Amino acid sequence: MARISNVNVPTNKRVMIGLTYIYGIGRSTAQKICQEVQVSVNKKVKDLSNQELVALRSIIESKYKVEGDLRREINLNIKKKKDIRCYEGLRHIRKLPVRGQNTHSNARTRKGKAIAIAGKKKPNK
């Protein structure tokens, strides 16, 4: 397996698909990186030369925030919004959808499992 940005990229996949295993790199970014290094997107990772791997690593490290750095930046941005208590921050604090989605009947993933509300007890017959 080729190792790029502390991620094991599968060798039997195409280069473009293999790069998407790195957090922060999607298909379009992977395609741009391949064009920059002048590697065919259809080439398999196992067929890459050492020079091409080094070029891929250097471009990813110099131009893109990936993996831990990107996760850290996203978490800091969310924390900053929570601290200044803006609308988005309040939605994060309350564990509700942030981007304007409806919550009346949906948003179970974000809100968590439904909690039963105790109602009136029915009289025994």
Curated annotation (Swiss-Prot):
InterPro entries: Rbsml_uS13_C, Ribosomal_uS13, Ribosomal_uS13-like_H2TH, Ribosomal_uS13_bac-type, Ribosomal_uS13_CS
Sequence similarity: Belongs to the universal ribosomal protein uS13 family.
Role played: Located at the top of the head of the 30S subunit, it contacts several helices of the 16S rRNA. In the 70S ribosome it contacts the 23S rRNA (bridge B1a) and protein L5 of the 50S subunit (bridge B1b), connecting the 2 subunits; these bridges are implicated in subunit movement. Contacts the tRNAs in the A and P-sites.
Record's GO cellular component terms: cytosol; small ribosomal subunit
Keywords: Ribonucleoprotein, Ribosomal protein, RNA-binding, rRNA-binding, tRNA-binding
MF GO annotations: rRNA binding; structural constituent of ribosome; tRNA binding
Name assigned to this protein: Small ribosomal subunit protein uS13
Organism, scientific name: Orientia tsutsugamushi (strain Ikeda)
Presence of keyword rRNA-binding: yes
Assembly and binders: Part of the 30S ribosomal subunit. Forms a loose heterodimer with protein S19. Forms two bridges to the 50S subunit in the 70S ribosome.
One Pfam family, short name: Ribosomal_S13
Keyword rRNA-binding tagged: yes
Any one Gene Ontology BP term: translation
